[in-house]
Amino acid sequence: MSYVENLRKYVGHQPVILVGALCLLFDRENRVLLQQRVHPHETWGLPGGLMELGESAEQTAAREVLEETGLTAEGLELVDVYSGKDNFAVAANGDAFYNVTIVYRANAYHGELMHEETESIQLAFFPLKALPEKMIGSHRRILNDFSEKE
């Protein structure tokens, strides 16, 4: 049972603060890797997820990339941290949370690209100027912010 599942047994749907990490991975054509997720509703998003007890944010990002894409991310560099009232959400099951999202960029990666079928439908690289329409809003904002800084 994950940390969040265990926590929810005690607090129910009450708002909690959850810490997670996302990772930007680019191919040789400078396209970003996105996954079409099963939840929420087949939207596209960046590889990433919630921190488990005892993990560093960097370890979380690397673990999630490996689990969701089959790739080993290397040379992670901090891009930005997103937090505050703009990062409040309520999941489909009614769980309320404030997300603290730590965004990394992988300078290199290796392995065979393959999606984990319980969490994602497919993986694909997209140009930053041609992101899919149906995308997790906060992930689109993160990529827009990143694109403006580059």
List the predicted regions and their residue ranges.
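Charged phosphate-binding loop/patch that engages nucleotide di/tri-phosphates or the phosphate backbone
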Residues: 140-150
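Conserved Nudix-box catalytic region and its N-terminal flanking loop in Nudix hydrolases
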Residues: 27-68
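Residues embedded in well-ordered beta-strands
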Residues: 22-24, 31-32, 103-105
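Conserved positions in beta-strands of structured domains
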Residues: 24-26, 79
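Acidic, metal-coordinating catalytic segment for phosphate/diphosphate chemistry
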Residues: 1-22
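Short connector loops at helix/strand junctions that flank enzyme active sites
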Residues: 18, 27, 39-41, 46, ...
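Unchanged
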Residues: 51-77, 82-141
